[in-house]
Amino acid sequence: VQYDIIDNNLIIIQKRCVIMNKLQNYLNDYVQKLDGDWSYLIYNLKNPQETICLNENHLHKSASMIKVLILATLCASDLDFNEKISIDYVPHVEGGGALQEMDSDTKVSIKALASLMIVLSDNLATNILIKKLGMHNIQAYADKLNLKQTKIQRYMMDFEASKQGRENYLTVNDYHKLLCHIYDNRHLARFNIAWQILARQQFRDRIPYYWDEDIIFHHKTGMLDFVEHDGGILEADFGTYSIIIFASNLKSNAIGGREMVKLGQYIYNYLAQK
């Protein structure tokens, strides 16, 4: 009987690997016809044999995806999550978020700043945390995690730094390692907070756009001019998957975003096959 169980498990694994190979062939053919530079990675955390990717080490401007690195660094730090910081701690910036609408004397806890940084992609909250942690410490944490191509070199919305060549960079491979680091440490209180924050992401207009609302995707989105990114970890009854898509050098954000929505729908439906 034990041999029968082993044989059945091998058959299931082989079937899933065939499904993944077919998915990879489809995705490769599809994205290579698209405008811009596309990278993707899909990885089964319970069965690493189910891994497919394309251009996984291609360097992209990180946009807001770098905020997940800041979140992980915060969890590993000794900063008190309950400490409150004035929102005037750094200069106010444009872009997404809620803090810029608040009175200048408002104080917000570090935990709330982390939530705003991810859930609403709040740039002011992000910059406060970058300054509080120290940009060099965030980079050092990336290096510690062996995120070989990851660079954090500027604050959010610092276009002058960008013009000078100081940019934030990620690959889908490094971002995948970062997600797995948070996932693997979610049993620790501080990392569990990060894990739950990622699940409350409000921007579901890319990879999970056509997924049911009750499907939890622990993820982050990122956007700059001609850049569209999304990536996270899906926990489903058919498996736990890291699903990441980065797109840069697009001719149009709108078109790139629509293509990512299509890819997200196709990937989910394909993985859900029995």
What label would you give each PLM region?
Residues 15-34, 51, 132, 183-205, ...:
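Structured C-terminal helix/loop/strand segments within mature extracytoplasmic catalytic/sensor domains
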Residues 37, 128-180:
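Mid-domain, small-residue-enriched loop/turn segments at the edges of structured enzyme/sensor domains
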Residues 48, 61-87, 243:
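Active-site SXXK
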Residues 84-96, 133-134:
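Acidic helix-start/capping segments at beta-turn-to-alpha-helix junctions
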Residues 93-128:
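Conserved catalytic neighborhood of penicillin-recognizing serine enzymes
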